[in-house]
């Protein structure tokens, strides 16, 4: 929960995480200021990747790095031309969803409470059980959610032959969200 509360504030020592991600994906050193159009190839929205983190905070970046290190072949597949999938932005969206859903977001006022975005007591209990049995459960869940979003949901939509683009991302993400809710509410 502590990491979920840390928002990303550049420039700082956390830029090293961006540089690590860059080295891992491009097999070369990252520009000193980390500003480069190369970030678009990893699914960021622009050449300043820190701008995409917003409410996801530093935890989002750590989860992107974890995923890229463990699933480098999947990242390269996600970013192939024609797949129209934005790896980094999708990962950040999943991170932010998990942060809110599993009650890890610091709420500053009653207005921040949108109970539709919070998991049920049963789902939270199931999540806590998982954390007790697996120290890396949070990162593992993020990885599984992102793989499922891409391979099953997104590529499934692409295989239907319809013209699926970034504009269909919310539809795909809603499908993932519904599956997560159903899964964690299962006894």
Predicted regions and their residues:
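Extended acidic/polar regulatory tracts at the flanks of large eukaryotic scaffold/adaptor proteins
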Residues: 1-187
């Amino acid at each position: 929960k502590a990491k979920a509360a840390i928002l990303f504030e550049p420039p700082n020592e956390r830029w090293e995480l961006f540089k690590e991600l860059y080295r891992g994906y491009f097999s070369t050193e990252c520009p000193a200021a980390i500003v480069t159009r190369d970030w678009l190839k990893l699914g960021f929205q622009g050449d300043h990747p820190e701008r995409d983190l917003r409410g996801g905070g530093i935890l989002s970046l750590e989860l992107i790095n974890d995923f890229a290190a463990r699933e480098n072949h999947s990242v390269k597949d996600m970013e192939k031309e024609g797949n129209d999938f934005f790896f980094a932005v999708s990962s950040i969206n999943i991170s932010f969803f998990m942060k809110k859903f599993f009650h890890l977001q610091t709420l500053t006022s009653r207005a921040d409470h949108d109970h539709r975005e919070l998991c049920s007591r049963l789902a939270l209990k199931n999540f806590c059980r998982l954390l007790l049995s697996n120290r890396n459960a949070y990162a593992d869940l993020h990885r599984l959610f992102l793989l499922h979003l891409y391979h099953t949901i997104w590529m499934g939509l692409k295989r239907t032959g319809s013209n699926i683009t970034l504009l269909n991302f919310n539809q795909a993400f809603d499908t993932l969200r519904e599956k997560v809710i159903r899964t964690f509410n299962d006894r």
